[in-house]
């Protein structure tokens, strides 16, 4: 019996990356990836003069298999909401949509990854415009350079060459203090810290430097709540009680 194969034109990448609703949503997806990799922190550095966004974590990095998974559209090996434990730290999985590399493409055309795992350093980069011009991207090969390195080197660094429009939009969003603080408060966990730095403007935000939620707008605060997904319990507090 004759068979046919599914093919996907490169314009699909452009369309999917544009459907990511906002630059803040895209950054949140990248923050989730660092959290799920058990990094103690993530640093987002925005360099307007260079049109570069750098996202750095100290997580467990990516193996060859995990790099392959990164480019599997809408497919994730993670189970959202499930507890995972690594080196005595337990976290609840945040990412599951398979949006890792599409989120990076929200900001620009060229993205470079550098990741360390088990004494190996892997470097690879992708140019979105090269993919978009392909008639069929299902068989596109992405070169990955892997070298031995010290096992003390860990984590992943993503370098994005941002286009002017997306950089301008991102800076406009983060110019509002409340929005910048909301970004670094995307995940509240004592074992994880989110750093945001905007070069040229000497702007720096960090989860560790935020006020506690219960201390925000105390005079106007009606109540606040705490929820435990483990106990499946909601606690309401008024005036600290």
Predicted regions: what is each one?
Residues 1-162, 167:
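GHKL (Bergerat-fold) ATPase N-terminal catalytic module, capturing the glycine-rich phosphate-binding loop
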Residues 16, 170-171, 187, 222-225, ...:
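Generic hydrophobic, helix-prone segments enriched in Leu/Val/Ile
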Residues 65-68, 174-177, 211:
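Generic alpha-helical secondary structure signal
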Residues 110-113, 125, 191-201, 223:
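Short polybasic amphipathic segments
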Residues 137-203:
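ATP-binding catalytic core of ATPases
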Residues 195-241:
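GHKL/Bergerat-fold ATPase module in large chromosome/replication-associated machines
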């Amino acid at each position: 019996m004759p068979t046919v194969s599914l093919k996907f034109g490169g314009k699909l990448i452009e369309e999917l990356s544009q459907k990511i609703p906002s630059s803040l949503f895209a950054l949140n997806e990248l923050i989730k990836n660092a959290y799920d990799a058990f990094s103690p922190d993530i640093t987002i550095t925005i360099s307007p003069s260079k049109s570069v966004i750098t996202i750095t974590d100290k997580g467990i990095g990516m193996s060859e298999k995990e790099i392959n998974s990164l480019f599997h559209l809408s497919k994730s090996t993670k189970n959202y909401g499930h507890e995972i434990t690594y080196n005595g730290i337990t976290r609840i999985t945040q990412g599951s949509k398979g949006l890792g590399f599409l989120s990076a493409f929200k900001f620009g055309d060229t993205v470079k990854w550098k990741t360390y795992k088990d004494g190996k350093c892997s470097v690879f980069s992708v140019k979105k415009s090269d993919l978009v011009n392909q008639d069929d991207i299902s068989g596109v090969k992405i070169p990955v350079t892997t070298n031995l390195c010290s096992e003390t080197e860990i984590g992943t660094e993503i370098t994005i060459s941002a286009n002017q429009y997306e950089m301008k939009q991102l800076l406009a969003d983060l110019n509002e203090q409340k929005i910048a603080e909301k970004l670094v408060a995307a995940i509240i966990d004592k074992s994880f810290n989110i750093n945001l730095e905007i070069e040229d403007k000497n702007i720096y935000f960090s989860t560790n430097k935020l006020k506690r939620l219960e201390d925000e707008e105390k005079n106007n605060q009606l109540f606040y709540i705490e929820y435990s997904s483990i106990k499946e319990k909601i606690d309401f507090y008024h005036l600290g009680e």
